[in-house]
């Protein structure tokens, strides 16, 4: 069975749809909830909803042009994403058609996994 970081690493972000972002202050740390519809892997024919919680978030940046996100929603408003690991922290960068998300985090979990 794959762990959550492996599941997220296999996601095909291109042409995915950003549905919701949320920040939560939980036990003196910030967590970030990302709800997307993405292709789970290369063999998946349709998008699946994923709810991913990033824990211990630091250095959060988010810029979004809402009109562009909405205009590109049916075709997919996510261009691509990459997760890097350095100095015991992860960093995710999500490029959108109409903006970007970028933040570092300590760990993540897939809350709702349809795989």
Model regions: which residues?
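Surface-exposed, interaction-prone regions used to assemble/regulate multi-protein complexes
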Residues: 1-115
